[in-house]
Design a protein with these regions (language model features):
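Conserved post-catalytic alpha-helical subdomain immediately downstream of the catalytic base
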Residues: 169, 177, 203-262
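Short acidic, glycine-rich surface-loop motifs adjacent to enzyme active sites
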Residues: 84-97
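A structural signal for isolated positions on well-ordered beta-strands in alpha/beta enzyme cores
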Residues: 6-10, 33, 87-89, 118, ...
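Conserved phosphate-binding/catalytic loop of the ribokinase/pfkB sugar-kinase fold
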Residues: 10, 34-40, 47-82
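Conserved phosphate/ATP/ADP-binding segment of small-molecule kinases
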Residues: 95-197
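Glycine-rich phosphate/diphosphate-binding loops that line cofactor/substrate pockets in enzymes
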Residues: 1-2, 78-86
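Substrate-binding N-lobe of the ribokinase-like
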Residues: 1-44, 259-262
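Extended, hydrophobic alpha-helical segments in both membrane/secreted and soluble proteins
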Residues: 89, 102, 106, 117-119, ...
Length: 263
């Protein structure tokens, strides 16, 4: 979408790592900060597709937490490049890279440099998320983060009392600037302290593959905020971007031309 990006993570010394670097370079993503750990296996996901629908996914990877020394190396690498950055997007996939120690380092860096911090959470980690700018859980993850059972469903999110309760609790407990809850075919809910929740209906016309939709949302939202959009404008752009990528088969991206056409 026109911004510069750097990838910070830990990979193995294997063919998957080589392929990852090749793909990142092809998309002009700076992969120089990637740290190689010969004791880890680079995550490789194999999706089995039948009649344009994903049937099952097989993951080959290492999921143990990275060593504290690697977390410090990652944080130092990010610190070096933050002078020219507007935001940090943190994707927690539960693969062992986003530890509490590393997340605390990132939060400290964000505060010191005054940059926006976005996180796509993985509730199973039970990390302390207080101090972030934005989190983008789906409905299931939001309820898990709040510790509330999701035993209701309402086709109109703003009338879903349990969902409203979860949103209010997460905003207060985590001291967030924005909470964006993705709701699948119901769109997304944007919540801010002191404001009423704002519901944005989905724009997806045909859904072939939801792989990467969450990444599209958090990436587009964060870029929009960094460029000066307000929280609702950013969410609307993210909603358009997600509507484009779910209409493609496989893990896909959205181009500026496609985004403009959707708008």
């Amino acid at each position: 979408l026109g911004c510069g990006a750097r990838m910070h993570s830990v990979i193995g010394r294997d063919d998957a790592a080589k392929k990852l670097r090749t793909l990142l370079k092809a998309d002009e993503v700076d992969c120089q900060p990637l740290i190689t750990d010969a004791d880890r296996q680079t995550s490789c996901k194999t999706r089995i597709i039948a009649q344009r629908q994903q049937v099952v996914r097989v993951d080959r990877e290492t999921r143990t937490d990275i060593m504290p020394r690697l977390a410090k190396r990652l944080a130092k690498s990010i610190d070096t490049g933050l002078a020219k950055s507007n935001a940090i997007v943190i994707g927690d996939y539960g693969k062992g890279v986003i530890t509490q120690e590393y997340l605390d380092e990132l939060k400290a860096l964000g505060q010191r440099h005054g940059v926006w911090l976005s996180l796509d959470p993985k509730p199973v980690h039970s990390l302390n998320l207080r101090g972030l700018s934005l989190i983008t859980p789906n409905r299931k993850e939001a309820f898990e983060l709040a510790g509330i059972d999701d035993n209701t469903y309402h086709a109109q999110p703003l009338k879903d009392q349990n969902l409203m309760r979860v949103a209010k609790q997460l905003l207060a407990d985590l001291e967030l600037e924005v909470l964006l809850i993705t709701l699948g075919d119901l769109g997304m809910l944007v919540c801010q302290p002191g404001s009423k929740p704002f519901h944005i209906p989905t724009l997806a016309r045909e859904v072939f593959d939801v792989s990467g939709a969450g990444d599209t949302v958090i990436g587009t939202y964060t870029l929009a905020v960094a460029a000066g959009a307000d929280p609702i404008e950013a969410a609307m752009l993210a909603n358009h971007a997600a509507g484009v990528v779910v209409g493609k088969l496989g893990t896909a991206t959205v181009t500026p031309k496609e985004l403009l056409a959707s708008i």
